[in-house]
């Protein structure tokens, strides 16, 4: 872009044009070290040189340096010996955070490098006689420069915008007089335009940055200058040959220009350093005024020296003022920095204190809420504790009342027991020491029976064989059972009921008469090597048990029901007389229900499975005929030697089919079939499902059983006279009936002990007196079985007789 002025420029930092002269300004651009410059700038300069230079009195080239707001950081900045800055990739540091000396040195180096931009354009102006350099400070942001110049150019200027394909021109107003004008207003117009045009660079480059002169704080001129650091553009003025007057006028205006710029556009730089960097003859002093030397005309030597002295004095004075201002600025900056630090510190302390206060308030509020919750919980806990205390006190009172009642009940029971046991002379009261001594400290070898109630020990008390039953009194039910057994047995005296000899109530011990042959169950199932009972003994046992049950059922004032009648509770003495034992579960029936009425009662069942009355098990109602069901099962077991499970339907089917003999006990070979079948029918009637279908024990069962027993006794007496032992039952050596017959090598049977003693001394037969082939003995099982059967008959026949 090219601007041509026709008026005097009476201000600003550029050269002053004399009256009537043409002033040509060309804006150029280019890169540092570029030998050719920008293509557009070359076209503009070439066009201006070819078209305007012959007409112009002064020719100026302007280059705008970008605003320097930051410099490279020290760790990536290397200063070469050639004083060129080499910048690598990294962070940059704002100028206000760097020392002034570093900034000034960096500015000088950058300015020196930007002078190379004019080299290619100076070559194009070789034909010019003189050039003049001075510096302008411009900003390059904003609207385009050509448009701004076209918009604001006064009528006294001609503007040429040289583009690649066209030239845009704004001509002067033809009505304006081109003659030299001496009016101050007209001269100021051209000057104001160039000043505004120069200022437009500043405005367009940084429209939002404040002017350093607008700083309101003391000492902020240096900070604003550092923040908006800029350099004046290097400009070269190519002049035509001048007259002495023009040279003089130009020289005379230098102080005036210097004075104008001193108050407004002087950048905050160290001018002494700046003079050192600009050592060329044409450089302006302090980046504002340069020496003007006319190549055609030279002023007198004395006048030139005097002006130079005046300029130097003025520069010296300005330097002193600048140094003073810089010093004051530094002090103000230090004070400002200190004040800012204090403000920051106070602000930080205030913020911290505010945070602490807020935290304390929040903590206090939280603690209050927590305290309120804790208080509420505490009051709730206190109420719960008070309620628990009240409940505990009530429970404690109720417990004391219950303990008193229990103690009263215990004392009453104890009194009853003491009266019952202490005044009853029907049995003897033993001490625990006597029982322990008799049982040898309850030795396991003395145990003859064991059940759910406890253990039975064999002992001798008062030179009488006895059986001590030790009951476990670990539950109230067992204590009640023990007391009931004592109560019942102490009132009973019957030949077919076990006799109670004495008791030790404190330790739960009962002393019974001792029955040598054990229980009926051992004979039915042949346990403990018990021999099978003959049929007539079985008939008699059934009759004796019926008599004992009839005695219990007819007791006064209330009938007694055994409730646990079974073969294990029927004991046999040495003469095979049966007695009913274990009356512990016996019950005194106060309200006997009729047999033809089914009643349901809430009672605890007692007894053994398969022997419990089905109706009693179903309804809970106990009757005397409940024992009759167990009695019928015992009859069928004595006939068949089978388990009670399913025995009733099996015998019933056998009787109906006539196959009863197949179910009878095989250990007995001489069953009377007629009497046996009649006895089986009685057992089936007693084992009916309903009580109303069972016969009466005393009026219907006992008479039939008595008749059968009498028939059996008569038959046994007839057979007893013919019971003599055969001769082969006797041992040839001992002449006695043999117990363990053994066959020797001679074919004869001997008693084992006798033949072994004979063979130790002899090797011949005791009968034939001949030598024996060997000494081996063979057991004669057939003969031993026959001998045992004969002995049993003889023994039971003697019992019957």
From Swiss-Prot:
Q: Which UniProt keywords apply?
A: ATP-binding, Coiled coil, Kinase, Nucleotide-binding, Serine/threonine-protein kinase, Transferase, Ubl conjugation pathway
Q: What is its EC number?
A: 2.3.2.27, 2.7.11.-
Q: In which pathway does it act?
A: Protein modification; protein ubiquitination
Tell me where in this chain the U-box domain is found: 724-797
* Domain of life, source organism: Eukaryota
Which SMART domains does this entry report, sorted A to Z? S_TKc (SM00220), Ubox (SM00504)
Q: Which portions of the chain have biased composition (kind: Polar residues)?
A: 236-254
Show the active-site residues: 564
PROSITE patterns (UniProt xref): PROTEIN_KINASE_ATP, PROTEIN_KINASE_DOM, PROTEIN_KINASE_ST, U_BOX
Gene Ontology MF: a single term: ubiquitin-protein transferase activity
- The chain's coiled-coil residues are 301-395
Which reaction(s) does the protein catalyse, per the Swiss-Prot or TrEMBL entry? Answer: L-seryl-[protein] + ATP = O-phospho-L-seryl-[protein] + ADP + H(+); L-threonyl-[protein] + ATP = O-phospho-L-threonyl-[protein] + ADP + H(+); S-ubiquitinyl-[E2 ubiquitin-conjugating enzyme]-L-cysteine + [acceptor protein]-L-lysine = [E2 ubiquitin-conjugating enzyme]-L-cysteine + N(6)-ubiquitinyl-[acceptor protein]-L-lysine
Record's compositionally biased regions (Basic and acidic residues): 289-309
InterPro entries tied to this protein: Kinase-like_dom_sf (IPR011009), Prot_kinase_dom (IPR000719), Protein_kinase_ATP_BS (IPR017441), Ser-Thr/Tyr_kinase_cat_dom (IPR001245), Ser/Thr_kinase_AS (IPR008271), U-box_ubiquitin_ligases (IPR051348), Ubox_domain (IPR003613), Znf_RING/FYVE/PHD (IPR013083)
The protein's matches in Gene3D superfamilies, at most eight in alphabetical order, are given as:
Phosphorylase Kinase, domain 1, Transferase(Phosphotransferase) domain 1, Zinc/RING finger domain, C3HC4 (zinc finger)
Cite the Pfam families for this sequence.
PK_Tyr_Ser-Thr, U-box
Q: Which residues bind ATP?
A: 448-456, 469
Query: In what residue span(s) does the Protein kinase domain sit?
Result: 442-705
Query: Where are the residues of the annotated region Disordered?
Result: 205-309
Q: Which GO BP annotation is one of this protein's?
A: protein ubiquitination
Sequence similarity: Belongs to the protein kinase superfamily. Ser/Thr protein kinase family.
Protein purpose: Functions as an E3 ubiquitin ligase.
What PANTHER family does this protein map onto? Answer: OS02G0152300 PROTEIN, U-BOX DOMAIN-CONTAINING PROTEIN 34
Q: What is this protein called?
A: U-box domain-containing protein 34
Q: From which source organism is this entry?
A: Arabidopsis thaliana (Mouse-ear cress)
Annotated gene: PUB34
């Amino acid at each position: 872009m090219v601007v041509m002025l026709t008026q005097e420029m009476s201000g600003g930092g550029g050269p002053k044009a004399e009256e009537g002269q043409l002033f040509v300004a060309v804006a150029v651009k280019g890169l540092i070290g570029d030998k050719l410059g920008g293509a557009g700038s070359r076209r503009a300069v070439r066009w201006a040189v070819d078209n305007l230079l012959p007409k112009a009195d002064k020719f100026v080239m302007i280059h705008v340096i970008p605003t320097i707001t930051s410099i490279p950081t020290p760790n990536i900045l290397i200063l070469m010996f050639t004083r060129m800055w080499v910048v690598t990739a990294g962070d940059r540091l704002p100028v206000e955070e760097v020392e002034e000396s570093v900034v000034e040195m960096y500015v000088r180096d950058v300015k020196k490098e930007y002078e190379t931009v004019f080299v290619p354009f100076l070559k194009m102006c070789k034909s010019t006689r003189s050039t003049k350099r001075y510096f302008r400070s411009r900003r390059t942001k904003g609207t385009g420069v050509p448009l701004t110049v076209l918009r604001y150019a006064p009528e006294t200027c001609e503007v040429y915008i040289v583009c690649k394909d066209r030239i845009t021109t704004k001509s002067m107003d033809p009505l304006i007089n081109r003659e030299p004008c001496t009016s101050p207003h007209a001269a100021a117009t051209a000057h104001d335009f160039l000043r505004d045009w120069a200022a437009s660079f500043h405005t367009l480059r940084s429209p939002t940055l404040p002017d350093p002169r607008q700083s309101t704080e003391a000492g902020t001129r240096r900070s604003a200058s550092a923040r908006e650091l800029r350099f004046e553009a290097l400009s070269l003025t190519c002049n035509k040959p001048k007259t002495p007057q023009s040279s003089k006028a130009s020289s005379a205006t230098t102080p005036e220009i210097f004075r104008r710029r001193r108050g407004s556009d002087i950048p905050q730089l160290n001018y002494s350093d700046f003079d050192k960097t600009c050592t060329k003859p044409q450089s302006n002093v302090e980046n504002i005024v340069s020496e003007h030397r006319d190549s055609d005309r030279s002023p007198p030597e004395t006048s030139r020296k005097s002006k130079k002295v005046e300029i130097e004095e003025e520069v010296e004075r300005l330097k002193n003022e600048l140094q003073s201002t810089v010093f004051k600025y530094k002090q103000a900056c230090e004070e400002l920095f200190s004040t800012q630090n204090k403000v920051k510190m106070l602000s930080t302390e205030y913020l911290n204190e505010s945070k602490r206060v807020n935290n304390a308030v929040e903590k206090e509020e939280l603690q209050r809420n927590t305290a309120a919750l804790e208080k509420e919980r505490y009051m709730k806990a206190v109420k719960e504790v008070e309620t628990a205390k009240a409940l505990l006190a009530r429970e404690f009172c109720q417990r004391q009342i219950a303990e008193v009642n229990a103690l009263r009940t215990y004392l009453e029971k104890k009194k009853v027991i003491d009266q019952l046991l202490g005044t009853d002379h029907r049995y003897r009261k033993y001490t625990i020491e006597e029982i322990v001594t008799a049982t040898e400290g309850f030795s396991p070898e003395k145990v003859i029976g064991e059940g759910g109630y406890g253990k039975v020990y064999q002992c001798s008390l008062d030179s009488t064989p006895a059986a001590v039953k030790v009951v476990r009194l670990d539950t109230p039910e067992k204590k009640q059972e023990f007391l009931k057994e004592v109560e019942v047995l102490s009132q009973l005296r019957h030949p077919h009921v076990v006799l109670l000899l004495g008791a030790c109530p404190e330790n739960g011990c009962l002393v019974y008469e001792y029955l040598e042959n054990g229980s009926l169950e051992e004979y039915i199932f042949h346990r403990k090597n018990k021999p099978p009972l003959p049929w007539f003994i079985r008939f008699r046992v059934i009759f004796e048990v019926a008599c004992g049950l009839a005695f219990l059922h007819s007791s006064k004032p209330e009938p007694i029901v055994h409730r646990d009648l079974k073969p294990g509770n029927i004991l046999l003495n040495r003469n095979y007389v049966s007695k009913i034992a274990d009356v512990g579960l016996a019950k005194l029936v106060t309200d006997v229900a009729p047999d033809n009425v089914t009643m349901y009662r809430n009672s605890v069942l007692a007894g053994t499975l398969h022997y419990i009355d089905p109706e009693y098990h179903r309804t809970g109602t106990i009757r005397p005929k409940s024992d009759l069901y167990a009695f019928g099962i015992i009859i069928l077991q004595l006939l068949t030697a089978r388990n009670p499970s399913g025995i009733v339907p099996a015998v019933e089917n056998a009787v109906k089919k006539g196959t009863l003999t197949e179910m009878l006990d095989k250990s007995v070979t001489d069953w009377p079939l007629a009497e046996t079948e009649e006895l089986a029918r009685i057992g089936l009637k007693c084992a009916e499902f309903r009580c109303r279908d069972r016969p009466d024990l005393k009026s219907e069962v006992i008479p039939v059983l008595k008749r059968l027993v009498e028939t059996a006794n008569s038959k046994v007496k007839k057979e007893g006279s013919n019971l003599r032992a055969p001769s082969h039952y006797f041992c040839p050596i001992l002449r006695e009936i043999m117990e363990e017959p053994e066959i020797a090598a001679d074919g004869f049977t001997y008693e084992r002990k006798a033949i072994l003693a004979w063979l130790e001394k002899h090797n011949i037969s005791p009968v034939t007196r001949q030598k024996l082939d060997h000494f081996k003995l063979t057991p004669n099982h057939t003969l031993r079985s026959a001998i045992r059967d004969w002995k049993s008959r003889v023994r039971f026949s003697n019992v019957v007789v």
